[in-house]
Amino acid sequence: MLLGITPLFISAQNITDMAVMNDRTADAFIENGTQISSIDDSVFVHPDRICYDRRCIRIEGKDVFVFSAAFHYFRVAQPLWADRFRKLKEGGFNCVETYIPWNWHERRMPRSPQDESCLDMKELDDFLKMAEDFGLYVIVRPGPYICAEWSGGGFPQWIMQKKPAKTAFDTWLQSNDPEFMRWNEHWYRAVCRTVAPHQLTRKEKGCTGVIFFQVENEFNRIKWFPKEAKKDYLIRLSQIVRKYEIDVPVITCWTDEARNVEEGVLNGVVDMVNSYPRWEIEKNFGRLINQQLRTQPGKPLISGELQGGWMSEVGGKLSWEQDGLMPVQTQNITLYALQRGFCGINYYMTVGGTNFDDWGARQMTTTYDYAAAIAENGSTNERYRRFRGLAHLLKEHGTRIARADVLPVEYTSTDPDVKLVLRQASNGDRYYFVRTEERTRHHFGTIQTSDFTFDFALEPFGAMIYYLPAGAEQGDWLPELPDAETRPTVKADTIRLIPDKRMADPLPTRWVKLKKGEYIDHDGIYGRHFVYYRTYAPQGKLLEVGRIGHKLINGTDADEVVVSVQGKRLPVFKEDAYSVFYQLPGDSAINRKVEVVMLFESKGLHHHTKKIVEDYWGIGLNYVRCGGKELSLEYAYTENERGLNLSKGGRLQEKTPTETTELNEPLLSWYSYSFTLPEQPRGVWFPYHLRLEHSGNGFIYINGHCIGRCWQKGPQREYYIPECWLNIGGEN
């Protein structure tokens, strides 16, 4: 196992844009079956296979409550997919949802939009096939923008090299600019050709497959394009989807321009509600539902992302340590969605994962556990138990509740913090929703209506349904949760790792010249590992190095630059949002140049698109100046290759003669560890984690794989090592 660490003390914060979720413009509105549908049935290519009305999703002529789990195949090692699918199936889910990141599937730059030689869609095809094998419906979300706390929001690093000199708008990504649309078609063509054979409409009746195809993502976040241009963009994306034989319903999320379109390809499109309300469910989730009902009359309520946890960011708290993410919240928010009439819910995330290598967005932790029901390491937890109980409820009652009407009911409650809402099915069955958002105590009491009285007992922040069949005098409380899982008491041995050696990273022996104004991605290097730079500057002068500074990109911290002259590091002289300055040693009166070696650390590519992100899209230093004059640069990108090689038992390259000065203080160090894992007891499984205390930032490599980044600032100190990458019973 190898750690490549630059010993720096840094800080980091990533501020997520919550503007869409916190929009306060919605009017109060209650849907009770009185709206007229605006859906033209012709929008459904195969209404006999899949369609929807204002209350329910219908598959092969039957109402189906879509109980969906977000599972990112690109965040879980492929040999472990089957384990996660099995747990989803056992958890009662009937659907799985995934983003499809463009940059994951096309890692090298094609020559033109017609060049498909750099695309590799096999992993997506394998994932869709496995979902079908487990009997799950699938929702696909190919962006092109996916957010997902993923590098570049899913856009390839090379995409900005395709941006024309003149564009329709200052910001290019997610615009209807003609050249950008050509590249969108390039991507969608590949996705559609992969997805099309897996659609439900291409399967025999009774089989599962892809049921929804989402175009774009969270488009309300984009405020810098006119609404007419945004709508045109969505229309053209939808036309591309249909052109390449996607015939299941098209959906969107957080996209006003797709709401209530009376004709054309967007007619009938459901714009889904995404909500992460934590403890304030009725206030925050309820407001978004009201907005959806007001702006999408006659459309079903579907949640594209309902809170199943939350991300962790560098310098913040790990997911399970955050407030408002307890499993009881999952039950409460689900029952509130049912109370409001939802017919489809996708929980983001349900399967936790890992931001392997450098794929995480700017300053995101390596772990993407998300406090999900199925953890990053594959274990299940109390949230999973809640989902199992909710799944049984939805299987028996989900579509009946969705088609039930809200009846006005006057009631008194002995506990003023407990509220009641009644939905009544067409056959007279009653569903009394009993909820509280008070979370400091248990709630015991009695509710009395004009014709019925019952006692309740709720946990803190509890929610239950009292189900009263038509004509019955007594009912049942739902959901019924399964017993907690009994776990083996066998524990894995803790293995204390002793470093085999600490090695200074040898300076590169080969350097590549950069043209003025170019970045290393212009040479086809798209990774964001450490980069060495070299230049020659007049001694005694002030060196200015251009890089992303503190809070320049969505409040994140600065990229780091370590500068060395004559084998010694230089302290930072001063810095601002755009540059960091170093005082070069020597007498400026003597006209002599010194060699300057720099190590650059990128904090990653942000997952939001906006002009400032596009302006700083390139990988590496923006410039190096001295006395106002821009200096020529050479670079070497060696750390990633060395890490993979060393972790497989290789050696650092031998020193060879080079004109570069050897460093007394290395800019980058390697820490090598080896260990033997014992065989696991028969019938017992446990995951392995690396617990790491360290200074500086770096990358973790093991057995030829890059696990991800390690950040001095934390909060992550334990790193899940996929068992399929470990040599169980042997040396690692």
Q: PLM features: residue spans?
A:
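Substrate-binding/catalytic cleft of secreted carbohydrate-active enzymes
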Residues: 35-40, 140, 144-183, 189-340, ...
